[in-house]
Every structure is written in structure tokens, then in C-alpha cells.
């Protein structure tokens, strides 16, 4: 088994060394090594919370508040995280001029924290480190949003 994994690593290294351009497609697996739970596996986020559909989220201030509260709770449970080996590899490929871009399902912003520019990152499900106001479009960092929710609850 280990020799098979080593063979795959060697093949990947060969492909990367020969490549002119690399596109990274990533999902939950790249961030689970960092301590971030995935959403769908047993014990994942959706086993604890029923997903909020987009229509409900957009039409109900209470649903938006609930969704943000859930997200903040998950963030606090996970705690601070650092980019993992996959994020670091993508950043190295960027610095080497080989990375065409990253397309990710993740919302954790770890590709950017590792050194991949936002301009080279497509986040299919958005970014969980900030949000835009639905009324004015202004960007707010998640810590600011958390403060607003806490102030509202007092």
C-alpha cells in the first residue's frame, strides 16, 4: 500500500515538473488535514444541522441570522487553522509561475492564506471569511459580523 502511494507521489512530482501550467481543483479533503470538518460525511456539519436552502436564506432575515450563527459556532468549534500541505503545494506552484489557478469548493480561504492570490482563486461556494451586505454590497470581515450579532443579542 505504501509503495503504491509512493509511486503515485513520484508520478505527481514528474507531472508537476514537466507541466507548464497547473490548475488545482480542491474540495473538503484538502482542508480536513487542517482540522476543518467536511459537511457530508458521518459526523460532518450536515449531520448536526439541517442545510438552509438559498431561497429560504435570501427571503428570511431570521434564516440569515440562523445561518450566520451556525457558521460562527462551527468556526469557533474548529478554532484557528493553518493551511495544509496541499495549500502549500499550490502556493509553491504559484511562486514557480506554473499555477494557472485554483478552483475550490472550500470556503475557508486557506489557499489565499498559503499564498495563492485571490485573483487566481475561484471559490465555487463563496468565502467564509467575509460577507457582503445584501442591501449596500459592502464587504465585511466575519469578525465584524460576529460583533454585530453579539451586540444585537445583548
Where are these regions (language model features)?
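Conserved catalytic core of sirtuin-type NAD+-dependent deacylases
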Residues: 1-154
